[in-house]
Amino acid sequence: MKKMTVCFLVLMMLLTLVIAGCSAEKSSGKSGETELTFWTFNGLHEQFYVEMVKEWNKKYPDRKIKLNTVVYPYGQMHDNLSISLIAGEGVPDIADVELARFSNFLKGSDIPLADLTPLIEKDRDKFVEARLTLYSKNGKLYGLDTHVGTTVMFYNMDVMKKAGVNPDDIKTWDDYHKAGQKVRKVTGKPMGTVETNDSATFLSMISQQNSGYFDKNGKLILNNDTNVKTLQYLKDMINDKTMIPAPGGGHHSEEYYGFMNQGGAASVLMPIWYMGRFIDYMPDLKGKIAIRPLPAWKEGGDRSAGLGGTATVVPKQSKHVELAKEFLAFAKGSEEGNKKLWSVLGFDPLRWDVWSSKELKEKNKYTDYFQNGTGIFSVLLDIKDEINPIYLHEDFAKASDLVNRSVLFDALKSQQKTPKQALDRAAGELKQK
């Protein structure tokens, strides 16, 4: 009975996709326009593409595009995309795929996504290479990211000054630990917070050391020595109260926003795109937050990581593959498009060569909020070559889920397992697939 119910739901979803596909085919724009269907799970991304369609239509008046955007809930969109690719019906022309789900579309040898490598070949040296590697398999690029996700440390300067600690003196994680002890002693507040239901803290810190869940050859390294030692380091800082588990489990929870907005901790490690969360959910910190590189694990070590991400893809089964690819290259591969990624979305663009452009220095809500707001991209330019690639494997989504759901909670929150035990168990589950 359960199997019949599942089959019925899948058939109904397929029928919905077919009907949606037929509707898209029947609807046509003005004479000379080609309609492209775009699926996303983030309504904000639609704003960016609306702007880029306007720019495209100005530049190519004889090849105008009408964008039909469908915004689905996160899980539904990824499920719909998988089913439509299998069925060969109702396939969008372009679609967003979030990092944690991307590996699901790279399985096997017959990858259903168009090769985007030629789109950026001419200017490849202008892109942050780690973010191209992230969405590649066997040397072919299958998605263009929406940002670099340069990971930094956000310091609450009110707390830091009260403790007599200068963030510019923090060069290594040991420096951070020592500074945190002083912050705790003087102010009674933790130096930072650690996510226990999301991997931002842990993954950034192991990526700094050129580690991850898989190596470049697809070998599982989730429980290697680097990862075990890093998780132990976080556990030690929690136990000596230098850091605490993030209220609500992560840095996107209402509990955390309220805690941090009241000056709850001296710092938080997150990608630069987290600026938007400060503005939207922590208004009382305006003018108090300074952005700095991450501490390195040793003097001269890497001071950043590339975190999070949503890549835009072109399914091979799109009815307008070539046009969709050209538009995607224009939107996310051009200098103009990369400047829009900042001005419309507040994201650090994939092309580092626009980071020093005047458009990225103009005052806006981001520059106004942060203490060193007008120098944000000066910080990022200084660390752009210190971002190591994260290698996606077809089991990356499962590995990520295990880390978020079990490893971090068991090792850091409940501490019912040692870091080694938690990572060994997760690695064992992945090997049993």
Curated annotation (Swiss-Prot):
Keywords (A to Z) from UniProt: Cell membrane, Lipoprotein, Membrane, Palmitate, Signal, Sugar transport, Transport
KW DNA repair (keyword) present: no
Signal peptide feature range: 1-21
Topology relative to the membrane: Lipid-anchor
Lipidation (S-diacylglycerol cysteine): 22
Keyword Transport: yes
Residues covalently joined to lipid (N-palmitoyl cysteine): 22
Subcellular location: Cell membrane
A single cellular component GO annotation: plasma membrane
Expression induction or repression: Transcription is repressed by glucose and by the binding of AraR to the operon promoter. L-arabinose acts as an inducer by inhibiting the binding of AraR to the DNA, thus allowing expression of the gene.
Effect of disrupting the coding gene: Deletion of the gene does not affect growth on glucose and arabinose, but it has a negative effect on the ability of the mutant to grow on the alpha-1,5-arabinose oligomers alpha-1,5-arabinobiose, alpha-1,5-arabinotriose and alpha-1,5-arabinotetraose. AraE/araN double mutant is unable to grow in the presence of alpha-1,5-arabinobiose.
A Pfam family assignment: SBP_bac_1
Major localization listed first in the record, in broad terms: membrane
Function: Part of the ABC transporter complex AraNPQ involved in the uptake of arabinooligosaccharides. Transports alpha-1,5-arabinooligosaccharides, at least up to four L-arabinosyl units. AraN captures the substrate and delivers it to the two transmembrane components.
Protein family: Belongs to the bacterial solute-binding protein 1 family.
Subunit description: The complex is composed of two ATP-binding proteins (MsmX), two transmembrane proteins (AraP and AraQ) and a solute-binding protein (AraN).
Descriptive protein name: Arabinooligosaccharide-binding protein
Gene: araN
